Protein backbone atom coordinates (compact mmCIF):
# COMPACT_ATOMS: atom_id res chain seq x y z
CA UNK A 1 0.00 0.00 0.00
CA UNK A 2 1.24 3.48 -0.89
CA UNK A 3 1.03 6.24 1.69
CA UNK A 4 2.32 9.72 2.48
CA UNK A 5 2.46 11.79 5.67
CA UNK A 6 2.19 15.56 5.87
CA UNK A 7 3.13 17.52 8.98
CA UNK A 8 2.17 20.86 10.52
CA UNK A 9 5.88 21.62 10.63
CA UNK A 10 6.39 21.99 14.36
CA UNK A 11 8.91 19.82 16.21
CA UNK A 12 6.32 17.50 17.75
CA UNK A 13 4.53 16.84 14.46
CA UNK A 14 7.76 16.39 12.47
CA UNK A 15 9.14 13.88 14.99
CA UNK A 16 5.91 11.88 14.96
CA UNK A 17 6.01 11.82 11.15
CA UNK A 18 9.54 10.39 11.15
CA UNK A 19 8.62 7.78 13.77
CA UNK A 20 5.61 6.64 11.75
CA UNK A 21 7.64 6.35 8.56
CA UNK A 22 10.13 4.18 10.47
CA UNK A 23 7.24 2.08 11.79
CA UNK A 24 5.78 1.55 8.31
CA UNK A 25 9.23 0.37 7.21
CA UNK A 26 8.58 -2.90 9.02
CA UNK A 27 5.59 -3.65 6.78
CA UNK A 28 4.79 -3.83 3.09
CA UNK A 29 4.11 -0.10 2.91
CA UNK A 30 5.58 2.22 0.27
CA UNK A 31 6.06 5.95 0.85
CA UNK A 32 4.78 7.79 -2.25
CA UNK A 33 3.93 11.50 -2.37
CA UNK A 34 2.78 11.35 -6.01
CA UNK A 35 0.14 8.61 -5.99
CA UNK A 36 -0.61 7.70 -2.36
CA UNK A 37 -3.59 5.58 -1.40
CA UNK A 38 -3.48 6.80 2.20
CA UNK A 39 -2.72 10.40 3.22
CA UNK A 40 -1.95 10.98 6.90
CA UNK A 41 -2.12 14.54 8.20
CA UNK A 42 -0.29 15.35 11.45
CA UNK A 43 -1.16 18.64 13.13
CA UNK A 44 -4.70 19.97 13.18
CA UNK A 45 -7.64 20.70 10.90
CA UNK A 46 -5.62 23.40 9.11
CA UNK A 47 -2.95 20.88 8.19
CA UNK A 48 -5.68 18.50 7.08
CA UNK A 49 -7.23 21.14 4.80
CA UNK A 50 -3.85 21.71 3.15
CA UNK A 51 -3.44 17.97 2.56
CA UNK A 52 -6.95 17.76 1.10
CA UNK A 53 -6.27 20.51 -1.43
CA UNK A 54 -2.87 19.06 -2.28
CA UNK A 55 -4.57 15.88 -3.48
CA UNK A 56 -8.00 17.15 -4.53
CA UNK A 57 -7.42 15.88 -8.09
CA UNK A 58 -7.09 12.30 -6.78
CA UNK A 59 -9.88 12.13 -4.21
CA UNK A 60 -11.37 8.93 -5.61
CA UNK A 61 -8.09 7.07 -5.04
CA UNK A 62 -7.25 8.39 -1.57
CA UNK A 63 -8.43 7.86 2.01
CA UNK A 64 -7.41 10.51 4.57
CA UNK A 65 -6.44 10.16 8.24
CA UNK A 66 -5.85 13.00 10.69
CA UNK A 67 -3.68 12.97 13.82
CA UNK A 68 -3.96 16.01 16.11
CA UNK A 69 -0.87 17.23 17.92
CA UNK A 70 -2.80 20.06 19.54
CA UNK A 71 -6.54 20.33 20.13
CA UNK A 72 -8.99 17.70 18.92
CA UNK A 73 -10.14 18.46 15.39
CA UNK A 74 -13.11 17.35 13.35
CA UNK A 75 -10.79 15.82 10.78
CA UNK A 76 -7.81 15.10 13.02
CA UNK A 77 -9.21 12.67 15.59
CA UNK A 78 -6.24 10.40 16.36
CA UNK A 79 -3.86 11.20 19.23
CA UNK A 80 -0.05 10.96 18.94
CA UNK A 81 -0.02 8.21 21.59
CA UNK A 82 -2.10 6.06 19.22
CA UNK A 83 0.32 6.37 16.28
CA UNK A 84 1.88 2.90 16.74
CA UNK A 85 -1.57 1.33 16.84
CA UNK A 86 -2.56 3.23 13.72
CA UNK A 87 0.53 2.00 11.86
CA UNK A 88 -0.34 -1.62 12.62
CA UNK A 89 -3.98 -1.21 11.64
CA UNK A 90 -3.06 0.47 8.36
CA UNK A 91 -0.49 -2.21 7.55
CA UNK A 92 -3.21 -4.84 7.99
CA UNK A 93 -5.64 -2.82 5.86
CA UNK A 94 -8.26 -2.99 8.60
CA UNK A 95 -10.30 0.08 7.84
CA UNK A 96 -13.51 1.22 6.18
CA UNK A 97 -14.00 4.22 3.93
CA UNK A 98 -16.41 6.92 5.09
CA UNK A 99 -17.36 9.63 2.59
CA UNK A 100 -18.35 13.29 3.16
CA UNK A 101 -19.94 15.72 0.67
CA UNK A 102 -17.97 18.61 -0.82
CA UNK A 103 -18.85 22.04 -2.18
CA UNK A 104 -18.30 23.10 -5.78
CA UNK A 105 -17.75 26.81 -6.42
CA UNK A 106 -17.78 28.21 -9.95
CA UNK A 107 -16.72 31.80 -10.60
CA UNK A 108 -17.73 33.29 -13.96
CA UNK A 109 -16.09 36.42 -15.33
CA UNK A 110 -16.59 38.94 -18.12
CA UNK A 111 -16.16 38.14 -21.80
CA UNK A 112 -12.84 36.58 -22.72
CA UNK A 113 -11.89 35.08 -19.37
CA UNK A 114 -12.31 31.40 -18.56
CA UNK A 115 -14.43 30.49 -15.54
CA UNK A 116 -12.72 29.08 -12.44
CA UNK A 117 -13.83 26.07 -10.39
CA UNK A 118 -12.94 25.30 -6.79
CA UNK A 119 -13.61 22.46 -4.37
CA UNK A 120 -14.18 23.12 -0.66
CA UNK A 121 -14.05 20.72 2.26
CA UNK A 122 -15.33 23.31 4.75
CA UNK A 123 -16.75 26.42 3.13
CA UNK A 124 -16.54 29.23 0.61
CA UNK A 125 -17.13 32.87 1.53
CA UNK A 126 -17.76 35.95 -0.59
CA UNK A 127 -17.07 39.53 0.51
CA UNK A 128 -16.70 42.86 -1.23
CA UNK A 129 -13.18 43.95 -2.15
CA UNK A 130 -13.83 47.31 -0.51
CA UNK A 131 -17.22 48.87 -1.19
CA UNK A 132 -20.73 47.75 -0.17
CA UNK A 133 -21.48 44.06 -0.72
CA UNK A 134 -24.68 43.80 -2.77
CA UNK A 135 -25.66 40.68 -4.73
CA UNK A 136 -28.81 39.09 -6.05
CA UNK A 137 -29.33 35.60 -4.64
CA UNK A 138 -30.84 33.31 -7.27
CA UNK A 139 -31.94 29.77 -6.39
CA UNK A 140 -32.50 27.37 -9.30
CA UNK A 141 -32.96 30.35 -11.66
CA UNK A 142 -35.53 31.94 -9.30
CA UNK A 143 -34.65 35.35 -7.87
CA UNK A 144 -34.84 34.94 -4.11
CA UNK A 145 -33.52 38.17 -2.59
CA UNK A 146 -31.14 41.10 -2.95
CA UNK A 147 -28.58 40.75 -0.18
CA UNK A 148 -26.80 43.70 1.39
CA UNK A 149 -24.28 43.17 4.18
CA UNK A 150 -20.71 42.12 4.86
CA UNK A 151 -20.83 38.89 2.87
CA UNK A 152 -22.16 35.34 2.54
CA UNK A 153 -20.83 31.92 3.53
CA UNK A 154 -21.71 28.61 1.88
CA UNK A 155 -20.59 25.55 3.83
CA UNK A 156 -20.47 21.80 3.48
CA UNK A 157 -22.12 19.62 6.17
CA UNK A 158 -18.77 18.91 7.85
CA UNK A 159 -17.86 22.58 7.46
CA UNK A 160 -20.91 23.73 9.41
CA UNK A 161 -18.87 23.30 12.60
CA UNK A 162 -16.37 25.91 11.38
CA UNK A 163 -17.06 29.51 10.22
CA UNK A 164 -20.74 28.69 9.65
CA UNK A 165 -21.21 28.01 13.36
CA UNK A 166 -19.73 31.37 14.36
CA UNK A 167 -22.25 33.02 12.01
CA UNK A 168 -25.17 31.32 13.76
CA UNK A 169 -25.67 28.56 11.23
CA UNK A 170 -27.00 25.12 12.08
CA UNK A 171 -24.77 22.07 12.49
CA UNK A 172 -25.42 19.39 9.87
CA UNK A 173 -24.49 15.73 9.97
CA UNK A 174 -21.98 14.91 7.19
CA UNK A 175 -24.17 12.07 5.91
CA UNK A 176 -26.56 14.73 4.56
CA UNK A 177 -25.70 15.69 0.99
CA UNK A 178 -26.43 19.39 1.22
CA UNK A 179 -24.94 22.87 1.59
CA UNK A 180 -25.81 25.74 3.92
CA UNK A 181 -25.86 29.49 3.22
CA UNK A 182 -25.37 31.90 6.14
CA UNK A 183 -25.32 35.69 6.22
CA UNK A 184 -22.58 37.99 7.46
CA UNK A 185 -24.04 41.09 9.12
CA UNK A 186 -26.96 41.63 6.72
CA UNK A 187 -28.59 45.07 6.46
CA UNK A 188 -32.24 44.93 7.49
CA UNK A 189 -34.39 48.06 7.87
CA UNK A 190 -37.52 49.64 6.37
CA UNK A 191 -35.89 49.79 2.96
CA UNK A 192 -33.72 46.67 2.76
CA UNK A 193 -34.71 43.16 3.84
CA UNK A 194 -33.09 39.73 3.70
CA UNK A 195 -34.39 36.36 4.85
CA UNK A 196 -32.23 36.67 7.97
CA UNK A 197 -31.96 32.89 8.44
CA UNK A 198 -29.52 30.19 7.33
CA UNK A 199 -30.70 28.33 4.23
CA UNK A 200 -30.05 24.63 3.59
CA UNK A 201 -30.06 23.32 0.02
CA UNK A 202 -30.15 19.69 -1.20
CA UNK A 203 -27.61 18.40 -3.68
CA UNK A 204 -29.63 19.11 -6.83
CA UNK A 205 -30.01 22.84 -6.07
CA UNK A 206 -27.84 25.58 -7.57
CA UNK A 207 -27.38 28.90 -5.78
CA UNK A 208 -26.16 31.81 -7.86
CA UNK A 209 -24.78 35.09 -6.48
CA UNK A 210 -24.99 37.84 -9.08
CA UNK A 211 -23.28 41.23 -8.56
CA UNK A 212 -25.46 44.32 -8.59
CA UNK A 213 -22.81 47.05 -8.76
CA UNK A 214 -19.28 46.15 -7.66
CA UNK A 215 -17.85 43.20 -9.60
CA UNK A 216 -14.67 42.72 -7.56
CA UNK A 217 -14.93 40.20 -4.72
CA UNK A 218 -12.72 38.55 -2.13
CA UNK A 219 -13.63 34.87 -2.44
CA UNK A 220 -12.32 32.25 -0.05
CA UNK A 221 -12.29 28.48 -0.42
CA UNK A 222 -11.35 26.90 2.90
CA UNK A 223 -8.02 28.52 3.86
CA UNK A 224 -7.40 30.03 0.41
CA UNK A 225 -8.56 33.64 -0.23
CA UNK A 226 -8.25 35.33 -3.63
CA UNK A 227 -9.35 38.70 -5.04
CA UNK A 228 -11.45 38.09 -8.16
CA UNK A 229 -12.11 40.95 -10.60
CA UNK A 230 -14.88 41.45 -13.15
CA UNK A 231 -17.02 38.72 -11.60
CA UNK A 232 -20.33 38.09 -13.37
CA UNK A 233 -21.61 35.20 -11.26
CA UNK A 234 -20.64 32.89 -8.39
CA UNK A 235 -22.37 29.50 -8.45
CA UNK A 236 -22.59 27.04 -5.57
CA UNK A 237 -23.70 23.42 -5.68
CA UNK A 238 -22.98 20.15 -3.91
CA UNK A 239 -20.08 18.58 -5.76
CA UNK A 240 -20.31 15.19 -7.44
CA UNK A 241 -16.96 14.45 -5.78
CA UNK A 242 -16.54 13.32 -2.19
CA UNK A 243 -13.72 13.14 0.32
CA UNK A 244 -12.98 9.70 1.79
CA UNK A 245 -11.71 8.96 5.29
CA UNK A 246 -10.12 5.76 6.57
CA UNK A 247 -12.09 4.74 9.65
CA UNK A 248 -10.86 2.11 12.10
CA UNK A 249 -13.29 2.72 14.96
CA UNK A 250 -16.57 4.36 15.78
CA UNK A 251 -16.30 8.06 16.57
CA UNK A 252 -19.80 9.51 16.01
CA UNK A 253 -20.10 13.03 14.60
CA UNK A 254 -22.17 14.23 17.54
CA UNK A 255 -19.51 12.92 19.93
CA UNK A 256 -16.99 15.11 18.11
CA UNK A 257 -19.32 18.09 18.43
CA UNK A 258 -19.74 17.42 22.14
CA UNK A 259 -16.02 16.97 22.77
CA UNK A 260 -15.11 20.09 20.78
CA UNK A 261 -17.71 22.57 22.01
CA UNK A 262 -19.25 21.26 25.23
CA UNK A 263 -17.20 18.54 26.96
CA UNK A 264 -18.47 18.08 30.51
Curated annotation (Swiss-Prot):
Keywords: ATP-binding, Cytoplasm, Kinase, NAD, NADP, Nucleotide-binding, Transferase. SUPFAM superfamilies: NAD kinase/diacylglycerol kinase-like (SSF111331). GO terms for biological process: NAD metabolic process; NADP biosynthetic process. It is found in: Cytoplasm. The active site is at residue 45. NAD(+) binds at residues 45-46, 122-123, 148, 150, 161-166, 185. One of its GO terms (molecular function) is NAD binding. It is an enzyme of class 2 (transferase). It catalyses: NAD(+) + ATP = ADP + NADP(+) + H(+). Its EC number is 2.7.1.23. Belongs to the NAD kinase family. HAMAP family: NAD_kinase (MF_00361). This is NAD kinase 1. The gene is nadK1.
